[in-house]
Amino acid sequence: IPGADDTPLNAYTVKPGSFDEDRPHAVLMYVYGGPGSQTVTDQWGGRRMLWFQYLAETYNVVVVSVDNRGTGGRGKAFQDIPYRDLGTPEAADQIAAAQSLADSSWVDADRIGIWGWSYGGYMTLMSMLTGDGPSTFTSGLAVAPVTDWRFYDTIYTERYMSTPQNNEAGYERGAPLNYADQMADTQDLIIVHGDYDDNVHFQNSVQMVDALQEANKQFQFMMYPGRNHGIYGGNTRLHLFTMLTDFIEESLIEEEPIIGATD
C-alpha cells in the first residue's frame, strides 16, 4: 500500500470468508507503528488475530494493518525517518494508506476506523486528528495512548526526539493534545486507560480528555481502576474487548451480525 510519499508499505488484510471484492466493506485498521516495530510479519498473530477473525466473520469487516515509515525490517534509513518528528510521518502514512484503500471497490470509504494500543493508541489519535485524518477516519479506538511525549520516559523519548529544549517544535507537532479541536463532529472516538499504567502514565489520557472537553468534542472514555498498561486482571479483558467490539459495531457496522457467528 502506498504511503504519504508513495513509498510502498507492507500490509496485511483479514477478510471474511464471504468476501466479495465488488461489495463495499467496513475497514478497521490496526496500527502500532512505533520505531523499529512490525505488525506485518510472516507469522501467526496470536490472540489478537483471533479477535480480528471474529470481527471479519461476524460483521463482514476487513481488518488491515500497515507498517508505516519508521517501523522495522526495512533498513536504517527507513526506520530513521521519524527522528525528531515522532508521529507526523507515521500518521501521514496511515492516512494515505486509508485513502488508498478507500479507492478500492471493496471498501466503504465512509466506514474506515483505526485502533491501536500504547504507541498504537498514540497513532490512532494522530491519524484521526492530523492532516486529512478527520475526513478519512470514521472512528478510532485509542487504548493507553501517549498524548504528549513530555509525559513519557526520557530513555525512550529522547532517543528519538532529543529533549524538549532542543526540539520544541517536534514535541509540539507530535502531541495529539494539540489537535483535539480538529476532531470532526462525524467522528466517533473511545479512549481507554488503566489508572495504574506504569508505562504510559494515566496522565496522558486525563490530559487528552481535558483537551477534548475544552474543545467541546463528544467522545467515550473508559478507565480501568488498578489496572496497568496491559489492562489485565479479573474480568477486565472480557469487559474491554466486549466494549471495543460493541463500539466497532455501533460506529462502523450497518448490517446485522451474521447469524450464528456469536454462538
For each predicted feature, which ranges?
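Serine-hydrolase catalytic core recognition
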Residues: 1-263
